[in-house]
Amino acid sequence: MGNDVSATVGHDSSTNDLQGVQTFVYPTKDELFRKVYVGEWVDGKRHGKGTLEWRNGAVYQGQWDSDTLCGIGSFHLPTSGVQYEGEFLDNQFHGAGVLTWKDNGRQYNGSWHEGKHHGYGTLKYDNNDSRQRIFYKGEWKHGKRHGYGIMKWRSGAQYEGNWTRGQRDGSGKQTFCNGDIHVGKWKGASRHGPGCRYLINGDKMFGTWKNDKKHGLFEYRYAHGRVEARLYVDGKLSPEPIAQGMNHVSQKRTIH
């Protein structure tokens, strides 16, 4: 706004008469919370383009609508290294925007709704994330991973599939750090329901998982062609194979 800023600076509690481009210093008994607005006013309300700066260094610069953050803008809080650039509505992140934590490298780039991740977006996790996650890219609902998305870990593991309220849930494909792949059903972040484990050595096993454990009758198909049945109970294998030479079992497997 530069030279267009009025020379008049307000210090009292009333902004009723402010019009056009003005500077207003908000009164406070605590200097720590002092804030200054420089920008456009309409009928005593911040409206148009303007900058609000707090004593602690926090700054909002962008569009206003009747005293609320609304439209395109940026918010920077230097004490914590947080910076947001994007759309606002009713003083909240709303629409498309990027939120960055500069101190640890965390960043969300995508859609927002009332201050929460909502829609499609990519979250890059902290450099020192305790769960060793690198990123999640996909759908969100009210701040949680929800819908279809991909998550990757530093170990090389990756999950691609459905999520519900932040957890793997429904149909999905998990690639493990050793190269094995599991395709099947998930519930509450655990393998639960029909699935197939593709081992890196070429072997395959088809069956049902319960609470992340193999449970029930499995078909184990070796890479060289031999097929046998195996019985698991809560992840524990029966001592002996149930049968060998199960060539009559269809090799076609479809997991919905």
Q: Predicted regions: what is each one?
A:
Residues 1-256:
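Intrinsically disordered, low-complexity repeat tracts enriched in Gly/Pro/Ser/Thr and acidic residues
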